């Protein structure tokens, strides 16, 4: 496309791209308020680089392609570093990584093997820490690579930043400059935003922005209150550099000095091994405690690094292989209001289709009316949409600079968009609800929940089939499912005799159900799978549970708070709900109850013990581990305290392991947990 531009058109386009990239650099580095996604920035940057390559006479030393980032703000003192913190060139496909390998080998012209170190590309804020004779004397942000902002008081508040280097087994250097990434865990980010929501403060768009904003505070007490972690990955100047010959030795030495380093680092890899590791990181990405946006690949030998050198922007011995974008910019064309199984009205953004992470996204959650108002989201807005793993895409930010004046503010409807019943919003809730329990939308969603895994688990009863059954008047309640016959189902779309036969068999099989799955399937508000398990353990049957709930006795059960107790009480106070339960029993639903074992018996080896799970386990998921612990009489909580008996730490355990160590709580690996669950099992 660029080959078709004449000289004046190319010059005009180059000027536009440079101005745009400078503006976005300033918004990203200085204001901590980016307007576009990383992927969109990368596209603009690549377009400019291609144009400059085609028209070398348009080269400019002040071009964004010749610079590392943006200049620092004047609010904090600045420092100029001797060895710049350069940017890293990006790759977006396997082919580009193979070309990188070819360039490296062609430049080195060596008969020695060329191997690589690969590590996750942390999505945080880069910093440099300077140590003299083992003491932290200065910390600075990356800034524009050469000049950074001094943040020493703030860095000292981060628990993972050593104030003094440790390690008796290695000589203490006179000078060491450590490069690392300050990140905020996903859990810490969610808790921080929840706290800011309570205080009516603006929410951070993502953990990276939260980390950057926390580091650049003028008041270090604010930084101290934020859940930040430093993960070290490299060095600048080092007085003992002659004793080190590889990049992986640097990582090992940093760990010896007391720094937290990335547990997912691999070395001695050829380029095919590097690509295999990239696939591995893609797979574990959702389960990591912190955000990563790709993989960094470095030539391992330091003498090879020195031979390869660097351009004005980036080293030639390193490249970042980035994941497919998790954020993209698109336009919000309409807002649809959906009705859930509890009557909650949820606004959903209808978007111009955009590809995020290899998936086409045309809808995104807007959460509720208050979130729309807080973010000032309007129909017609250009918006930043985020998709993380299997999480429903969400609109995280409005790009107000692109508004035309034709955008329309959103207003929640006064009546249910499905059944027309006037909607209600309680003063204490952020949710507007349709109060008509017979609303077809609520009926459909309740039955879908009832039939889902973890509840009645009716194989073959998908969402579209439920919609058909309700729309045709064939079912209106849970119990109606147990009256369906093969001949009834054959008339439905895409439902032949064999499929109908299989579905009837699956419904029949679901009649035999454990008490906890039954309770979960009823769809009581605030009663998820875990709460259902707690309730099922506490009572020998549905009648005893209902009696205790109506008497206000559920608060005495460990793990059941006031909100849950009130919700269960309200459920059983409604005669229609009692009738629903009775109808299911009358239609042959048979509840199964686990045999009660003595708390001290062999079958309940974890009775009275409290566990916290963190990191990625190898032989089972964390949810499976929770189920096994609870089945053995143990209790699983979400946070570490002095009352915790064990922390089970898998790969990339995060801050929970650190807290356990600080409190003296016993830490188990997966094999240790298995030995408690089943002596002799590994």
Curated annotation (Swiss-Prot):
> Which reaction does this enzyme catalyse, per its entry?
NAD(+) + (deoxyribonucleotide)n-3'-hydroxyl + 5'-phospho-(deoxyribonucleotide)m = (deoxyribonucleotide)n+m + AMP + beta-nicotinamide D-nucleotide
One GO term under biological process is: DNA repair
Gene Ontology molecular function terms on file: DNA binding; DNA ligase (NAD+) activity; metal ion binding
Q: Which UniProt keywords apply?
A: DNA damage, DNA repair, DNA replication, Ligase, Magnesium, Manganese, Metal-binding, NAD, Zinc
- Is DNA-binding included in the keywords of this UniProt record? no
- Superkingdom of source: Bacteria
Record carries keyword Ubl conjugation:
no
Active site annotated at which positions? 121
Required cofactors, per record? Mg(2+); Mn(2+)
Entry GO terms, CC? cytosol
SMART domains attached here?
Answer: BRCT (SM00292), HhH1 (SM00278), LIGANc (SM00532)
Where along the chain is NAD(+) bound?
Answer: 38-42, 87-88, 119, 142, 181, 298, 322
Q: Quote the EC number.
A: 6.5.1.2
Q: Give me the residues that bind Zn(2+), please.
A: 416, 419, 434, 439
Checking Pfam families in the record gives: BRCT, DNA_ligase_aden, DNA_ligase_OB, DNA_ligase_ZBD, HHH_2, HHH_5, Nlig-Ia
Where does the BRCT domain start and stop, copy by copy?
Answer: 601-682
| Primary role | DNA ligase that catalyzes the formation of phosphodiester linkages between 5'-phosphoryl and 3'-hydroxyl groups in double-stranded DNA using NAD as a coenzyme and as the energy source for the reaction. It is essential for DNA replication and repair of damaged DNA.
Which NCBIfam families does the UniProt record give? dnlj, PRK07956.1
The Swiss-Prot or TrEMBL record describes its family as follows: Belongs to the NAD-dependent DNA ligase family. LigA subfamily.
PANTHER family for the chain = CHROMOSOME TRANSMISSION FIDELITY FACTOR 18, DNA LIGASE
The name this protein goes by in its record: DNA ligase
Organism annotation: Desulfosudis oleivorans (strain DSM 6200 / JCM 39069 / Hxd3) (Desulfococcus oleovorans)
Gene that encodes it? ligA
